[in-house]
UniProtKB/Swiss-Prot annotation:
The family this protein is said to belong to: Belongs to the bacterial ribosomal protein bL19 family.
Keywords, comma-separated and alphabetical: Ribonucleoprotein, Ribosomal protein
UniProt-listed Pfam families: Ribosomal_L19 (PF01245)
GO cellular component, one term: cytosolic large ribosomal subunit
Protein's recorded name: Large ribosomal subunit protein bL19
GO biological process, one term: translation
Length: 115
């Protein structure tokens, strides 16, 4: 029975997901339905956490909008996500960057990873 579930989950996985790590700046384009219209909405920020669970994988993106911190959790293989673009690679030494929630301004900056 579990082999059937694994096979179905494998078919649902997206193949075009770029490799990114915590600290990277990404732009996620998401399909949004407003009434009868369907349009793309971009959400650009820093990846602060990644949860690897196969089909149930997710990542958290944080940005500052009008001086207020906004975090959004995206399911990596969701059909709602149109594209994920890595804008900048960040050099961090931790897997979860929750400490950025308390930081503002220059102390919330992340060095760029070279190479």
């Amino acid at each position: 029975m579990s082999n059937i579930i694994k096979q179905i989950e494998q078919e649902q996985l997206k193949q075009d997901v770029p490799s990114f790590r915590p600290g990277d700046s990404v732009e996620v384009k998401v399909w949004v339905v407003e009434g009868a219209k369907k349009r793309l909405q971009a959400f650009e920020g820093v990846v602060i956490a990644i949860r690897n669970r196969g089909l149930h994988s997710a990542f958290t993106v944080r940005k500052i909008s009008n001086g207020e911190g906004v975090e959004r959790v995206f399911q990596t293989h969701s059909p709602v996500i149109d594209s994920i673009t890595v804008k900048r690679r960040g050099a961090v030494r931790q897997a979860k960057l929750y400490y950025l929630r308390e930081r503002t301004g220059k102390s919330a900056r992340i060095k760029e990873r070279l190479g």
